[in-house]
């Protein structure tokens, strides 16, 4: 999959795109990310990309010509088949479902706004979709575009283990259950005993219960949309008073950390 990013600050993406999973995905040829400087499509010696808003008001507005020319030049004949996204606080909320939709395309264009926004004719001419990553305002669309790239890239086949994706928050419609690893005791807090039992059926049920309970406590809107089974409703009746409190045993005394091994070794 290819991402084309249009920005006036291309340097903002350098570190983010050259580390961790995104770096490996690019090296493996699973994704390609191209950063385009909108100023390269300006026509004056000052490489101007903004001007004062018609009707008055504070700040500056990004001009339509450089952005439209940049997108049309880069996308060429693929413009009509490529989703064009404008990152904007007034856009629809970016969700995991939208990410799954976008991941089905071989190419995605992301336009990063700045200042007071982008001339609305850009959206109309390019038939662009406006997306927001949350109910807050950033100084520009670059961080938001990076979020979209990260989320969508994870859904490209081969980038992430499919089993890992299935267990993550929002992919199942619920928040994820709490995770633990070694050591089995740290600062007096022990791993929930069910996770050390080796009983995979009970572990799976506990994890499902905790996912349900955490979603009910923190994101009831997600729970209302989830397809719940009769067993899920039974598990919801067993929710602890605070599903975000520590769910394992608590130890007192000097031995606040216990080494690996023995009966308390993590079940794998």
Swiss-Prot record:
Q: What is its main location?
A: cytoplasm
Q: Where does S-adenosyl-L-methionine bind?
A: 113, 133-138
Q: What is its EC number?
A: 2.1.1.228
Role according to the record: Specifically methylates guanosine-37 in various tRNAs.
Q: Which HAMAP family match?
A: TrmD (MF_00605)
CC per GO annotation: cytosol
Q: Where is this region: Disordered?
A: 238-268
Species in which this protein is naturally found: Thermomicrobium roseum (strain ATCC 27502 / DSM 5159 / P-2)
Q: Which gene encodes it?
A: trmD
| Location of the protein in the cell | Cytoplasm
Keyword S-adenosyl-L-methionine assigned? yes
Q: What GO biological process terms does the UniProt entry carry, in alphabetical order?
A: tRNA N1-guanine methylation
Keyword terms:
Cytoplasm, Methyltransferase, S-adenosyl-L-methionine, Transferase, tRNA processing
Source organism superkingdom? Bacteria
What family does the database annotate?
Belongs to the RNA methyltransferase TrmD family.
Its recorded name reads tRNA (guanine-N(1)-)-methyltransferase
Taking the record's annotation, the residue ranges forming a coiled coil are: none
Q: How does it assemble?
A: Homodimer.
